[in-house]
Amino acid sequence: MINGEHLKIGLLEGAFNKLRKNPTRDSILFRHNVAGDIAIEGTSLIDVNRVDTIAGAIEGANKVVGEIIKGYTFTHCMIDLHASDIIHDAAYKGFLINASCETVEEVKHAKALGINAVIASVDPKETEKELKAVGLYGAQCPAQVKEGMDCNHCQLCAKNRKVVIIFGIHGSHKGKARKAIQIHRAKASNLAKL
């Protein structure tokens, strides 16, 4: 379990260190979970206690340093109305949770609930077209397409936005990812037919 007070102190320490280096800084990015999720262990349900602890720590730290810490993460958790309420409450406190999707249908579902979405793709241009066909705007992750761009400069994933961020899958895991996405899409398609 995460200790909210320790997390708040850690966030403040990091914020003060960054502000000492650059006092005119207008935002500090905090990404929770480079790997992992915010689910209750062994389930696909959002762990409301974990989310509340993180969001509360960010909110508390921002009261001290002036709303400059932008917290964000990604989740593969099931997105229902209860999860949507948790996600919206966290965003209000400064912790933006992106629905991490593998199909356009998952993106549509998340966006219909007002949740920011990202999607993994083996063909980002094709995914952009698929999103456009259902009335959504997608753009590939700027850090993947712009020389010298990184998450700290972009901060798009930490912002409330209309655009769906497309993460192009590359490298040695592309084949495995393609297969996993195809299996996931096939399962989703079969469930839709029931």
Describe every region a protein language model picked out.
Residues M1-L194:
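Class I S-adenosyl-L-methionine
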